[in-house]
From Swiss-Prot:
<comment type="function">
    <text>Involved in pyrimidine catabolism. Catalyzes the deamination of 3-aminoacrylate to malonic semialdehyde, a reaction that can also occur spontaneously. RutC may facilitate the reaction and modulate the metabolic fitness, rather than catalyzing essential functions.</text>
</comment>
<protein>
    <recommendedName>
        <fullName>3-aminoacrylate deaminase RutC</fullName>
        <ecNumber>3.5.-.-</ecNumber>
    </recommendedName>
</protein>
<dbReference type="InterPro" id="IPR019898">
    <property type="entry name" value="RutC"/>
</dbReference>
<dbReference type="GO" id="GO:0019239">
    <property type="term" value="F:deaminase activity"/>
</dbReference>
<keyword id="KW-0378">Hydrolase</keyword>
<dbReference type="InterPro" id="IPR006175">
    <property type="entry name" value="YjgF/YER057c/UK114"/>
</dbReference>
<comment type="similarity">
    <text>Belongs to the RutC family.</text>
</comment>
<dbReference type="GO" id="GO:0006212">
    <property type="term" value="P:uracil catabolic process"/>
</dbReference>
<dbReference type="GO" id="GO:0005829">
    <property type="term" value="C:cytosol"/>
</dbReference>
<dbReference type="InterPro" id="IPR035959">
    <property type="entry name" value="RutC-like_sf"/>
</dbReference>
<dbReference type="GO" id="GO:0019740">
    <property type="term" value="P:nitrogen utilization"/>
</dbReference>
<dbReference type="Pfam" id="PF01042">
    <property type="entry name" value="Ribonuc_L-PSP"/>
</dbReference>
Amino acid sequence: MPKTVITPPGTGTPIAPFSPGTLADGIVYVSGTLAFDKDNNVAFPGDAEAQTRQVLETIKSVIETAGGTMEDVVMNHIFLTDWVHYAPMNKVYAEYFPGDKPARYCIQCGLVKPGFVVEIASVAHIGKP
């Protein structure tokens, strides 16, 4: 199965060996996405709303680079460091998914660096039926 690595223009170097996204058979797999600043530091430490917005903008960029839109998202995997971030994350999340909602799950866990409070990985189906 052929696959294409998706790296939006202006994307920084990942802190680990992975691609921002991979397109295979009309499906875009977006890696777990965190709110990094341009220097690979934590952006908006502890701010769930600001981090969620940046994360979803990054995910949107990956999907659009692959030829899709946020309406093509079929699944989101959400990771929060604490349940106090659930409501602020959902507030921003609802702005990006105003119509039919994709499937999702949300778990509480530790993240790669202190200050990160939200991570999201997504799957979007951009292929034609």
